[in-house]
């Protein structure tokens, strides 16, 4: 099986403001991707897979999205992150799930966050579900 620890486009903004993250670390079973921005302004993704029980495998996915800003210190403009938003997702899959079962789970995840659906619409509008 080919490695899936490769760079990918995290934010697809029609090519003009795309954010690509590249592999940066893989230690203790945790894969980390980071954007090329300065460390304080970088987008970061981590993913780990653990055996959560004899019957289940647990994926833990975390995404950090920075609010990019600058700060002037001593007449020098420095890049900083004004704040960060964090996404944490846990996915538990029975070890006896087939590849087609897992493909269906991925399709459900993609549908969950598809543009125009209620959850991403609420997040994009900084509002609730109503």
UniProtKB/Swiss-Prot annotation:
<protein>
    <recommendedName>
        <fullName>Capsid protein</fullName>
    </recommendedName>
</protein>
<comment type="subunit">
    <text>Homodimer. The capsid proteins form dimers that assemble by group of 5. Twelve such pentamers are linked together with free dimers. The homodimers binds to the viral RNA via an operator hairpin, but also to many other RNA sequences in the viral genome; this interaction probably shifts the virus from the replicative to the assembly phase and ensures specific encapsidation of the viral genome.</text>
</comment>
<keyword id="KW-0810">Translation regulation</keyword>
<comment type="similarity">
    <text>Belongs to the Leviviricetes capsid protein family.</text>
</comment>
<dbReference type="Pfam" id="PF01819">
    <property type="entry name" value="Levi_coat"/>
</dbReference>
<keyword id="KW-0167">Capsid protein</keyword>
<comment type="function">
    <text>Capsid protein self-assembles to form an icosahedral capsid with a T=3 symmetry, about 26 nm in diameter, and consisting of 89 capsid proteins dimers (178 capsid proteins). Involved in viral genome encapsidation through the interaction between a capsid protein dimer and the multiple packaging signals present in the RNA genome. The capsid also contains 1 copy of the A2 maturation protein.</text>
</comment>
<dbReference type="InterPro" id="IPR015954">
    <property type="entry name" value="Phage_RNA-type_capsid"/>
</dbReference>
<dbReference type="GO" id="GO:0006417">
    <property type="term" value="P:regulation of translation"/>
</dbReference>
<keyword id="KW-0946">Virion</keyword>
<dbReference type="GO" id="GO:0039617">
    <property type="term" value="C:T=3 icosahedral viral capsid"/>
</dbReference>
<dbReference type="GO" id="GO:0005198">
    <property type="term" value="F:structural molecule activity"/>
</dbReference>
<keyword id="KW-1142">T=3 icosahedral capsid protein</keyword>
<dbReference type="GO" id="GO:0003723">
    <property type="term" value="F:RNA binding"/>
</dbReference>
<dbReference type="InterPro" id="IPR002703">
    <property type="entry name" value="Levivir_coat"/>
</dbReference>
<keyword id="KW-0694">RNA-binding</keyword>
<feature type="region of interest" description="Viral RNA-binding">
    <location>
        <begin position="32"/>
        <end position="105"/>
    </location>
</feature>
<comment type="function">
    <text>Acts as a translational repressor of viral replicase synthesis late in infection. This latter function is the result of capsid protein interaction with an RNA hairpin which contains the replicase ribosome-binding site.</text>
</comment>
């Amino acid at each position: 099986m080919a490695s899936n620890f490769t760079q990918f486009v995290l934010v697809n903004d029609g090519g003009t403001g795309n954010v690509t993250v590249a592999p940066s670390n893989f230690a203790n079973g945790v894969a980390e991707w980071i954007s090329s921005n300065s460390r304080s302004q970088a987008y970061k993704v981590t993913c780990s897979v653990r055996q959560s029980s004899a019957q289940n495998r647990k994926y833990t996915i975390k995404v950090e999205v920075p609010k990019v800003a600058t700060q002037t210190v001593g007449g020098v403009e420095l890049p900083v992150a004004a704040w960060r938003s964090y996404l944490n997702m846990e996915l538990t899959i029975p070890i006896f799930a087939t590849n087609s079962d897992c493909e269906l789970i991925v399709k459900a995840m993609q549908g969950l966050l598809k543009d125009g659906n209620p959850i991403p619409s609420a997040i994009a509008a900084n509002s609730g579900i109503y």
